[in-house]
UniProtKB/Swiss-Prot annotation:
Main function: Catalyzes the isomerization between 2-isopropylmalate and 3-isopropylmalate, via the formation of 2-isopropylmaleate.
EC number of the protein: 4.2.1.33
Species the sequence originates in: Ralstonia nicotianae (strain ATCC BAA-1114 / GMI1000)
Gene name per UniProt: leuD
GO cellular component terms listed in the entry, alphabetical order: 3-isopropylmalate dehydratase complex
Protein name: 3-isopropylmalate dehydratase small subunit
Biological process, per Gene Ontology: L-leucine biosynthetic process
Spans traversing the lipid bilayer: none
Length: 216
């Protein structure tokens, strides 16, 4: 998993409340057995005018010019600004996969659905909770100024505006440690690979029959 320390990026404002995971990545794209390739279908029903299906050539599909991610000024955005209860609905992990694979590194909102919030941390995506008034201010600035960027400093736990205003945010010590070091669940486990191997060797020495395969 990619480490997250300090990130400065263009902000895209998604001015909708209660964005659910089916809007983030529609159900038909969950058929894939891979965990890659979801970025092109992020917010599929909002980005395109037709109904998307897995395997389509998205370059030939009609775009919705009014949707924020299709507007030229927000191309290349890596910080998503959202409204309350972002990520509600089903618990599909494909939602943070799609957001990350599109290019987002952080999401700022007044609140998140709990399971989505947890899945973000497990996949290297930083969800940041700010107050509604702070989020309102960021929406106003993002929409008023083309090329509006924010700096997210995970170590200091602040979001910094171009004017130097710093908004502090909370994150648990464990989640912060994992993001700073790029550890997902597997990465955390592999830190103890030597101890695991030593335990398995010791266990098999005491109970060698466990190494035998059953026949029949």
């Amino acid at each position: 998993m990619e480490q997250f320390t300090i990130h400065t990026g263009l902000v895209a404002p998604l001015d909708r409340e209660n964005v659910d995971t089916d809007a983030i990545i529609p159900k038909q794209f969950l058929k894939s057995i891979k965990r890659t390739g979801f970025g092109p279908n992020l917010f599929d029903e909002w980005r395109y005018k037709d109904v998307g299906e897995p395997g389509q050539d998205n370059s030939k599909r009609p775009l919705n010019p009014d949707f924020v991610l299709n507007q030229p000024r927000y191309q290349g955005a890596s910080v998503l600004l959202a409204r309350k209860n972002f990520g509600c609905g089903s618990s599909r992990e494909h939602a943070p996969w799609a957001l990350q694979q599109y290019g987002f590194r952080a999401i700022i909102a007044p609140s998140f659905a709990d399971i989505f919030f947890n899945n973000c941390f497990k996949n290297g995506l930083l969800p940041i909770v700010l107050t509604e008034s702070q989020v309102d201010h960021l929406f106003n600035e993002t929409q008023a100024f083309t090329g509006y960027q924010l700096t997210v400093d995970l170590d200091k736990q602040v979001v910094v505006t171009p004017g130097g205003t710093a908004y502090p945010f909370d994150v648990t010590a464990f989640r912060k440690y994992c993001l700073l070091n790029g550890f997902d669940d597997i990465g955390l486990t592999l830190r103890y690979a030597d101890q695991i191997k030593a335990y398995e060797a010791q266990r098999l020495a005491k109970m060698p029959w466990l190494a035998h395969k059953l026949v029949g």
